[in-house]
């Protein structure tokens, strides 16, 4: 039936990614709507008590409660899994809900996790503060160095967890090498792929077991809603992750799922155009600031690795001034086009000072260890004409003496 073509994986897995992003997962109702329907309902009715009992027993196909299943949410999950090349996906309320769930569902007291040093501030809180409360130990390594992963692994190590590119320092992790180290030891690799999205990087193709996302970022792409996602094998999603999420309740709403579905339709176009814009803006800044951390530029120490793993550089990068927080804040305050915002992945250009925003809650010694100094600024380049962004940065840099 054509109205369910988007659910037929024998068809959809033959499509190219740009087509999958528009049509993957779509299941039209009897009305034949061209845009996915929003099923704003908390529950579902049954024709008889026996049907209700059969559904809860898993003997009858159908919905029971929107904390567990929702047609709009399931369309989004099918589409993300398709783009990722994964067997299954589970969405959640936020990216951090996804990161928390993907770790807690598979770790218990006495287990050990190895995590990448460069990470989003809340992810470092999760591994450094929350997990130890449950008797789970974490070792932090420079994720760029495969030998450090080897040295940190123990008999009780259950998970390798890292971002690539990392937020906000743009560290790039050798996916093939680190995933191979984990697989040889029976360790599950969880990759936060939010900066790249499956449009630019598919970690599972390099050996990752699980990928996790803040779908708030590039997947939505317009700064509208919060959402998170985890992709993996059907066994992992249904047997390991789902029991945790269905009983703890980080359920994505149907409306937010629909918004992300709409965002995915333009993901391929947006992220490639923003990558092009980012390169142009980065090339300009490279001539004006003391240091730039942009994986798309040859000056990045891991440029070759980044370009081998990614289809394009992405819209986000970091750079440094030389006058500390005062100069960094002065630069932000002098901007007239670029917004001061701690979000990323938006169609608008956004800039933030991570040490005083996204990583404010990280202890100073850990921030410095991560490379999040008072000089560091993070820039998300949007869909504006890059020359307008460059001119705004030019005048702001001049005002702070750069």
Regions found by a protein language model. Give the residues of each.
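A common structural junction motif
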Residues: 248-249, 334-345, 396-402
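N-terminal "arm"/small-domain region of PLP-dependent enzymes with the aminotransferase-like
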Residues: 2-70, 78
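Conserved C-terminal alpha-helix-loop-beta "cap" of PLP-dependent enzymes
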Residues: 293-377, 381
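Glycine-rich beta-alpha junction loops
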Residues: 26, 40-46, 195, 217, ...
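Short amphipathic alpha-helical segments
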Residues: 61, 87, 226, 256, ...
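Conserved N-terminal alpha-helix of the aminotransferase class I/II PLP-enzyme fold
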Residues: 48-97, 122-129
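Conserved PLP-enzyme active-site core in the AAT-like
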Residues: 6-12, 18-30, 88-293
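PLP-dependent enzyme catalytic core of the Aspartate aminotransferase-like
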Residues: 1-5, 128-129, 137, 349-402
């Amino acid at each position: 039936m054509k109205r369910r073509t988007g659910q037929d994986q024998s068809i959809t897995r033959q499509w190219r990614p740009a087509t999958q992003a528009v049509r993957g997962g779509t299941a039209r109702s009897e009305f034949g709507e061209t845009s996915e329907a929003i099923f704003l309902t908390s529950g579902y009715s049954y024709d008889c008590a026996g049907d209700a009992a059969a559904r809860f027993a898993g003997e009858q196909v159908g919905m029971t409660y929107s904390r567990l299943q929702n047609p709009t949410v399931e369309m989004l999950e099918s589409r993300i899994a398709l783009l990722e090349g994964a067997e299954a996906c589970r969405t959640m309320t936020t990216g951090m809900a996804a990161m928390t769930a993907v770790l807690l569902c598979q770790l218990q007291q006495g287990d050990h996790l190895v995590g990448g040093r460069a990470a989003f501030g809340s992810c470092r809180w999760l591994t450094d503060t929350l997990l130890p409360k449950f008797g789970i130990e974490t070792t932090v390594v420079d994720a760029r160095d495969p030998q450090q992963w080897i040295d940190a692994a123990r008999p009780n190590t259950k998970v390798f967890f890292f971002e690539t590119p990392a937020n906000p320092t743009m560290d790039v992790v050798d996916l093939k090498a680190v995933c191979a180290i984990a697989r040889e030891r029976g360790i599950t690799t969880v990759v936060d792929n939010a900066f790249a999205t499956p449009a630019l990087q598919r970690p599972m193709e390099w050996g990752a077991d699980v990928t996790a996302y803040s779908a708030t970022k590039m997947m939505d792409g317009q700064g509208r809603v919060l959402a998170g996602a985890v992709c993996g094998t059907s066994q992992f999603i249904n047997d390991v992750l789902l029991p945790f999420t269905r009983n703890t309740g980080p359920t994505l709403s149907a409306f937010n799922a629909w918004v992300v579905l709409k965002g995915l339709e333009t993901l391929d176009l947006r992220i490639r155009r923003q990558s092009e814009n980012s390169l142009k803006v980065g090339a300009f800044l490279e001539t004006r600031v003391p240091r730039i951390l942009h994986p798309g530029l040859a000056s990045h120490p891991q440029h070759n690795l980044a370009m081998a793993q990614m289809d394009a550089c992405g819209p986000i990068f970091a750079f440094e001034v030389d006058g500390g927080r005062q100069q960094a804040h002065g630069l932000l305050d002098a901007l007239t086009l670029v917004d001061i915002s701690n979000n990323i992945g938006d169609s608008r250009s956004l800039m933030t000072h991570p040490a005083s925003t996204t990583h404010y809650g990280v202890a100073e010694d850990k921030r410095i260890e991560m490379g999040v100094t008072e000089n560091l600024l993070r820039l998300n380049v949007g869909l504006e004409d890059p020359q307008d962004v460059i001119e705004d940065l030019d005048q702001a840099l001049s005002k702070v003496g750069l």
